[in-house]
Amino acid sequence: QTPQWATGHFM
């Protein structure tokens, strides 16, 4: 379960 902020931060 990945937060929305983590999606743009790591990817």
Swiss-Prot record:
Keywords annotated in UniProt: Amidation, Amphibian defense peptide, Pyrrolidone carboxylic acid, Secreted
- What highest taxon heads this organism's lineage? Eukaryota
> Main localization of the protein?
secreted
- Secreted as a keyword of this entry, yes or no, is yes
| PTM sites of type Methionine amide | M11
Any one GO cellular component localisation term in the record = extracellular region
List the InterPro entries hit by this protein, alphabetically.
Bombesin
Q: What is any one GO biological process for this UniProt entry?
A: defense response
According to its UniProt record, where is this protein located? Secreted
Q: What does the similarity note say?
A: Belongs to the bombesin/neuromedin-B/ranatensin family.
Q: Return the protein name.
A: Ranatensin-C
Lineage, please? Eukaryota, Metazoa, Chordata, Craniata, Vertebrata
